[in-house]
Amino acid sequence: MGKEKTHINIVVIGHVDSGKSTTTGHLIYKCGGIDKRTIEKFEKEAAEMGKGSFKYAWVLDKLKAERERGITIDISLWKFETSKYYVTIIDAPGHRDFIKNMITGTSQADCAVLIVAAGVGEFEAGISKNGQTREHALLAYTLGVKQLIVGVNKMDSTEPPYSQKRYEEIVKEVSTYIKKIGYNPDTVAFVPISGWNGDNMLEPSANMPWFKGWKVTRKDGSASGTTLLEALDCILPPTRPTDKPLRLPLQDVYKIGGIGTVPVGRVETGVLKPGMVVTFAPVNVTTEVKSVEMHHEALSEALPGDNVGFNVKNVSVKDVRRGNVAGDSKNDPPMEAAGFTAQVIILNHPGQISAGYAPVLDCHTAHIACKFAELKEKIDRRSGKKLEDGPKFLKSGDAAIVDMVPGKPMCVESFSDYPPLGRFAVRDMRQTVAVGVIKAVDKKAAGAGKVTKSAQKAQKAK
């Protein structure tokens, strides 16, 4: 087998009809974890329903339907391989909770793949003021997804088909647009593709002899190639934050007979090891980690990205819960936030938001009502420059610096220190009305919390 390939996460963004599903389906289909039998079954069903022309998207549709019904699908279906990477598609938009997922970050994407449709009138609809192309790209950038690949899709349906002129026009427009957001177009691979016909997906297309390939220039090494798969292969490998102090937001806490209390969650930063003394915030409980396991196997250490369960001594299920954060008691332990300052972008709110507004925030695994205590300044959402001090209200499209106060104890961090704990979605009326990035946290001085006997013993022994 040789060395394991590096795992990377991508998020696929773009307007509804840009062909994201077909393109993604094509990659999964040709390089992915779906076995031949399943593919044949899908093809047969698609043909019976007269959806033969829809087979790649159909693959994704089947997966999505199962995902939405809460059937935990075999996640290998959302994976495919390039020569260098195992790629996981962490979310495909069109999924109701896409924006929320992208922000609360079931995982952080290493790269965004923006699909734009080249068909007559389609590109214009996608990038128009109310098209989703802009919003998705802006979100990706705001949330720290700094690498981007652009697939100019449906090249087979331009006028005339595979038109170089149309492709160049789109590249020019998208470059201007992503530059305004903050991406540097020189670092972005643009690839003319047909997710349906397969042009420039895995193999160079014979239909576009004019396309001499894509090139990116960046300080960590330049790259060039022809296909979308090659562009994915040239994503810069992520650096996982093992050197930071531990932060592990809890997804659940189980009580397991004969073992005891087992919190479960994903290590976001740092390392979790048996024998460590951890503090849970905001509840301020400190205890010793007895064992750590993943997929029912004991680990000597858990690293960022690992979903683990860990057994803690002398702590009841009532002491800790989902949304709490575990950290190393001796190395910048997590603390309750009395309040925090954030930069927010209002996405879709029907009215005006003023001080006192108290929607629910989804930040890492916490889900807590927070009050917009003070609107400090309105800013330009691209440059971050101040537009006005102390605005009276905010409306859709506005960006602002806001002081927020949680309604219940909560643990968050600044985006610059701990990115996964420093971005949030604002939910109201069953939709995401705003997104935010935390600039600074006012930490509550922790009183004497609960320190278990095993923690005291472990601390003495050290």
From Swiss-Prot:
Residues 14-21 are annotated as: G1. Translation elongation factor that catalyzes the GTP-dependent binding of aminoacyl-tRNA (aa-tRNA) to the A-site of ribosomes during the elongation phase of protein synthesis. Base pairing between the mRNA codon and the aa-tRNA anticodon promotes GTP hydrolysis, releasing the aa-tRNA from EEF1A1 and allowing its accommodation into the ribosome. The growing protein chain is subsequently transferred from the P-site peptidyl tRNA to the A-site aa-tRNA, extending it by one amino acid through ribosome-catalyzed peptide bond formation. Keywords: Acetylation, Cell membrane, Cytoplasm, Elongation factor, GTP-binding, Hydrolase, Isopeptide bond, Membrane, Methylation, Nucleotide-binding, Nucleus, Phosphoprotein, Protein biosynthesis, Ubl conjugation. Residues 5-242 form the tr-type G domain. There is a cross-link at K385 (Glycyl lysine isopeptide (Lys-Gly) (interchain with G-Cter in ubiquitin)). It comes from Rattus norvegicus (Rat). This is Elongation factor 1-alpha 1. Residues 70-74 are annotated as: G2. The modification N6-acetyllysine is found at K165, K172, K273, K392, K439. Residues 194-196 are annotated as: G5. Found in a nuclear export complex with XPO5, EEF1A1, Ran and aminoacylated tRNA. Interacts with PARP1 and TXK. Interacts with KARS1. May interact with ERGIC2. Interacts with IFIT1 (via TPR repeats 4-7). May interact with ERGIC2. Interacts with IFIT1 (via TPR repeats 4-7). Interacts with DLC1, facilitating distribution to the membrane periphery and ruffles upon growth factor stimulation. Interacts with ZPR1; the interaction occurs in a epidermal growth factor (EGF)-dependent manner. Interacts with PPP1R16B. ISGylated. Phosphorylated by TXK. Phosphorylation by PASK increases translation efficiency. Phosphorylated by ROCK2. Phosphorylation by TGFBR1 inhibits translation elongation. It comes from the Eukaryota.
